[in-house]
Each structure stands twice: as structure tokens, then as C-alpha cells.
Curated annotation (Swiss-Prot):
Protein name: Uridylate kinase
Keyword line: ATP-binding, Cytoplasm, Kinase, Nucleotide-binding, Pyrimidine biosynthesis, Transferase
Regulation: Inhibited by UTP.
InterPro entries (UniProt xref): AceGlu_kinase-like_sf, Asp/Glu/Uridylate_kinase, Uridylate_kinase, Uridylate_kinase_bac
Amino acid sequence: MTAAAYKRILLKLSGEALMGDDAYGINEDVVSRIVSEIAEVTRLGVEVGVVIGGGNIFRGMKGAASGMDRATADYMGMLATVMNAMALADAMRRNGVEARVQSALRIDQVVEPYIRGRAIRHLEEGRVVIFAAGTGNPFFTTDTAAALRGSEIAAQIVLKATKVDGVYTADPKKDPAAQRFHRISFDEAIGRNLAVLDATAFALCRDQKLPINVFSIFKPGALKRVVMGEDEGTLVHS
């Protein structure tokens, strides 16, 4: 069997990815399919960390826009990510994948606190670690949490799972002539003003020379193809 291109990855999942076609919440069929994709990768011997968003339940920026205190709204968004992480971990266990949730906000009766050394040990022992509650601080996105946790656990790449199959020259929904980048450097992405991750997360990945692959979580087998080093999505590199 061909070896995977990466030994340890950080997968960034948006909360919206868990909704499927629903307007709100967690779609069990979608979660089951995502779990099966992750399970397939773990069977290759790849160590998987996951950062998950909470936008399917509550989005801090939206709460702040409606007049809520921004920090309060962000903390509510962090709690939403804990709910998503617990649902994902439960689905993994039901599918034979060992998983642990570590939260940047302490909720010790429910999930483990985030402890870097413990997270790395879980990964080394073949468990999927789902990092919840973002960075634990308001004003930082879960994209930034993905860049931070990816750097902390010495992941070899951040995989951003989205609804589109990569980074394009323009919005492919609006411009039928838009073309997908197969590979692009951090500097070129900045020069073209491409929104790969939010600015803080992008800068951290660039400074740490941590590559990013943007791909569609809705394409069957895409996660495995990325991990195997195939031409899937868009690779952003130093």
C-alpha cells in the first residue's frame, strides 16, 4: 500500500458542514459520512486532530451584529463548538474510531481540558483529538484555532474542509470562467487577496511554514486523496 503523504494532520471543519441541507443543527447522515472519511484516513496510520466550528448552532459575529456584547457572543459560539465536538466524537466511537474531545474552556464533567502534551499522546496512540471552544478567547475565529492547534501539535498540514473544492481565481458561483488553483504560495494568495483563512490564521500558518489545503468535504474520498498527496483541492505553501 502506498504510504500517506502526511503523518499528522489538522482538519478544520466548519459547523455549517454538519448541517448538510438543513437550516440549523446537526444532520446525522452528514456526520456519519464525515466520520467514515476520517476513519478511512486513520486506517492509513495518519494521526488526526480536528478543530470544529459552531456556526450551525450559534455564530458569535452574528450575535454581535445584532447588538449582543461581542465577547459574550464569542463565548456562546465556543460553547456551540463543544456541542458539535461531542456529537462528532460520539459518532466516531459508534463507528469504531477512538476519539477524545479537548476544550479550551474547562468543562471537566463533560470533556477533557486542552492539554498539549495529552493531546499529542492521544494522537500517538491512534486516537482522533477534537479541539473544541476555539482558542478559548473571544475575538479569535476557529480558523485561528486551527492554525494555532496545528502549530502546537506539530501537524504537517492544515486541511480546511469547505463547500467548494479549492481556491479559485474568482467566486465560481458567480464567474463560470473562474479557475481553481492547484498550488499557490502564501505570498501570491496575499497578493491576489484570496480569502483562504482569516488574516490572523493565515499569517500564523505562513510564519510557521504550515501548509494549507482547501478542499470540499462533500466530495467522496477527497480527504483521503489529500492525505495521499493527490491533486485534490488547493495547496497553499511557503
